[in-house]
């Protein structure tokens, strides 16, 4: 009887210690991204990174998502309704430095590594998806880009310059004509191979993606990529000529994957 009791006590202690270790590991992982709240309808945290104080928050209510990201005193805000494909993105015309953009990518990479630490990239909440997509979108703006207010309502937008194709899926390894313009309004048309030169047409930079999450392949993203290749730098294809193409790709970043634009 004593032996049986001692055996049960040892089993209990083993399970208690095992659970404590798991909880400690989860707590340590939370701290790496400054996570404070992690629920299906909310993701929130803050931490110091790369010399900046970063705060992020995404909240869902009736499939309407509000995202707020702060880097020191700079605030970036977005509202997304996935039912109606409504987007409003506003940065109050702030211009981020290259280091600030680098920091947004860094926090996104850390959050992505935390969320997909088990290797699966298909199991995510829409709150997680929305935050990662916006972090990448904001971080990959053209040089000296002013984060003006952008509004998409279905196929309509407040943008007045450029050629917005809505969310038009394109297929990898096919030829599609990219249409874009420069800062003077001159229009260019180039027939290009989708998935050619550094993954032309992918909503995001390079291959594989910056974060471990599915990406869309769309016409607006092709237009922006080709604009950058021709009018931007050879290694960092983002400049003032391609700001309108960048803005027009906002809905592609967020809704392209959900529309099935996976190439």
Predicted regions and their residues:
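Bacterial N-terminal signal peptides that target proteins for export
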Residues: 1-9
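Extended terminal accessory/targeting regions
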Residues: 26-263
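C-terminal motif of bacterial Sec signal peptides marking the signal peptidase cleavage site
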Residues: 17-20
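Bacterial signal peptide processing site
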Residues: 22-24
């Amino acid at each position: 009887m004593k032996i049986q009791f001692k055996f049960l006590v040892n089993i209990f202690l083993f399970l208690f210690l095992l659970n404590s270790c798991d909880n400690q590991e989860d707590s340590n992982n939370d701290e790496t991204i400054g996570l404070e709240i992690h629920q299906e309808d909310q993701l929130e945290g803050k931490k110091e990174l790369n010399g900046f104080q970063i705060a992020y928050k995404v909240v869902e209510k009736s499939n309407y998502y509000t995202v707020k990201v702060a880097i020191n005193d700079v605030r970036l805000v977005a509202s997304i309704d996935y039912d109606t494909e409504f987007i409003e993105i506003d940065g109050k015309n702030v211009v981020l430095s290259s280091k600030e953009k680098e920091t947004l990518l860094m926090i996104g990479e850390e959050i992505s590594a935390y969320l997909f630490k088990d290797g699966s990239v298909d199991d995510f909440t829409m709150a997680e998806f929305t935050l990662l997509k916006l972090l990448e979108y904001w971080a990959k703006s053209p040089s000296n880009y002013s984060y003006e207010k952008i509004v998409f309502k279905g196929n309509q937008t407040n943008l007045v310059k450029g050629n917005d194709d809505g969310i038009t899926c394109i297929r990898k390894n096919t030829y599609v004509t990219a249409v874009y313009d420069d800062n003077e309004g001159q229009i260019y048309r180039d027939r290009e191979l989708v998935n050619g030169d550094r993954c032309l047409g992918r909503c995001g930079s390079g291959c594989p993606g910056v974060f471990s999450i599915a990406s869309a392949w769309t016409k607006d993203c092709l237009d922006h990529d080709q604009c950058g290749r021709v009018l931007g730098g050879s290694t960092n294809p983002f400049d003032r000529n391609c700001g309108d193409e960048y803005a027009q790709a906002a809905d592609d970043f967020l809704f392209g994957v959900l529309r099935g634009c996976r190439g």
